[in-house]
Amino acid sequence: MEADAPAGYRDPSGRHGAVTLPARPEPIAFDADTTVLIVVDMQNAYATKGGYLDLAGFDVSATGPVIERIAQAVAAARAAGIRVVWFQNGWDPDYVEAGGPGSPNWHKSNALKTMRRRPEMNQRLLAKGTWDYALVDALTPEPGDIVLPKPRYSGFYNTPLDSMLRARGIRTLVFTGIATNVCVESTLRDGYHREYFGIVLADATHQAGPPALQEGALRNIETFFGWVSDVAAFEAALSSDEARRIPA
């Protein structure tokens, strides 16, 4: 392996991907046909005033530009032939999937705690079929995209994500969405433990909590679990001559 070769999956012959993305801590290479763009939980609950995070006391005022950059990343991915995976976090209207007092989720979920404090919000927060659960209007899945519900922070927990990725030969996961320090990081970590290469487009994510949590999550990811880049670099890498080259 060349000393200056980018990080990323290599096939049995040692060939790395045709797309090289500038990233921290080093560039990473991937092929479009073995990569997916994952959009994590871009629901009204997490990105819109009046949604769960807002009602629970988290600041969602800066999510507008994040939504715009996710839309850019989705458009770039589709143009390059990269499949898009959308996650929606939540539970059935009776919250059976959320777990009862015997589950740590019952004790730690801020949505469940908010509804216990405010009973009038019951069956309105993160319940399937509600406005809160729905994706924001500006981001719409298209035919060919994959849309998956998930009942916990990680997109690998109790979902078919892993089998769907392996069936398609996917090796690289590019992440956008909310919240960087919760569901994005949890899913990327679980992907790392399953031998997937994880990349976060930092400016297409947003934290739940103060800005220091965004910085800490990204630092943790680039140091231990994956790579960190941005939407402009992703767009430029996908439109490069090298990216258009068909491997021999």
From Swiss-Prot:
Catalytic activity, EC: 3.5.1.110
Pfam families: Isochorismatase
Catalytic activities: (Z)-3-ureidoacrylate + H2O + H(+) = (Z)-3-aminoacrylate + NH4(+) + CO2; (Z)-3-ureidoacrylate + H2O = (Z)-3-aminoacrylate + carbamate + H(+); (Z)-2-methylureidoacrylate + H2O + H(+) = (Z)-2-methylaminoacrylate + NH4(+) + CO2
CDD domains recorded: cysteine_hydrolases
Catalytic residue list: D41 (proton acceptor), K150, C183 (nucleophile)
Domain of life where this protein originates: Bacteria
Top-level EC class as recorded in UniProt: hydrolase
GO MF term list: hydrolase activity, acting on carbon-nitrogen (but not peptide) bonds, in linear amides
InterPro entries recorded: Isochorismatase-like_dom, Isochorismatase-like_hydrls, Isochorismatase-like_sf, RutB
Keywords, sorted A to Z: Hydrolase
GO biological process: nitrogen utilization; uracil catabolic process
Protein's job: Hydrolyzes ureidoacrylate to form aminoacrylate and carbamate. The carbamate hydrolyzes spontaneously, thereby releasing one of the nitrogen atoms of the pyrimidine ring as ammonia and one of its carbon atoms as CO2.
Family the UniProt entry places it in: Belongs to the isochorismatase family. RutB subfamily.
This protein's name: Ureidoacrylate amidohydrolase RutB
Origin species: Methylorubrum extorquens (strain CM4 / NCIMB 13688)
